[in-house]
Amino acid sequence: MKKENQSFNLDFILLGVTSQQEQNNVFFVIFLCIYPITLTGNLLIILAICADIRLHNPMYFLLANLSLVDIIFSSVTIPKVLANHLLGSKFISFGGCLMQMYFMIALAKADSYTLAAMAYDRAVAISCPLHYTTIMSPRSCILLIAGSWVIGNTSALPHTLLTASLSFCGNQEVANFYCDIMPLLKLSCSDVHFNVKMMYLGVGVFSLPLLCIIVSYVQVFSTVFQVPSTKSLFKAFCTCGSHLTVVFLYYGTTMGMYFRPLTSYSPKDAVITVMYVAVTPALNPFIYSLRNWDMKAALQKLFSKRISS
């Protein structure tokens, strides 16, 4: 009990992206530039979808949810990084650290399952166009979105509770700019074997959406290649290209971080986390709007309304 009380009274020290202060100053500027872009870009996507009745369909409903997840995902960590840098502090409370870890895991899972739902939506639209409105009904969309949030939160809870039960024996220095599960497990002086097993189980849960995405796109392209039409092929690539780009960005960075043994983790890996915590959520609005004529038109309409009013 004494050890548990000591842990709950412990303040962690977030070492930042690197151990070099000059490099952390550079990352501060990067975060300071990226965060407003993330908020503005994703908020514009949500507003454009809400304002344009032509975008009131499953594909854009799922995209709006992805933008919402990305806004919250970035807001869990980046404001704390910016505030600590400005205040000259690196501290975060034990409770604050656990909350940060909980939301990061929950939102990462919600993000991955939303990406899977978007791939499923495209597969149904291209492979079963006559049954699309029946399969992707408003009720189905709500269930897919609700399911992604429920799975995310239920996946994050056991990891958070297990981490809360660990002792840290005064070890305070977290080798990252936020409370990630891997540096916390390496920091603990308790037996973390069960925690590690649960973490790998969580990685498995995280991998399921990727499997769904692969199956969905195999179905999409097998359908498209059966139709001897260059126009159909081009349309499929335009429709799915943006989503596939986001999937590669998201899973490429997270797999490089978590699909490996805990012992291989090093402080240098914090640089990788910048990619999926800050860069990917900022790029998503540009990726989805640059190659999507309907989204471009909706954004232009939104801006013209704001200017005229």
Swiss-Prot record:
Disulfide bonds join C97-C189. GO terms for biological process: positive regulation of cytokinesis; signal transduction. Residues 1-25, 80-100, 159-195, 259-270 are extracellular. Signal peptide: none annotated. SUPFAM superfamilies: Family A G protein-coupled receptor-like. It is a multi-pass membrane protein. Residues 50-57, 121-139, 219-235, 291-309 are cytoplasmic. Odorant receptor. This is Olfactory receptor 1A2. It comes from Homo sapiens (Human). The lineage of its organism: Eukaryota, Metazoa, Chordata, Craniata, Vertebrata. The gene is OR1A2.
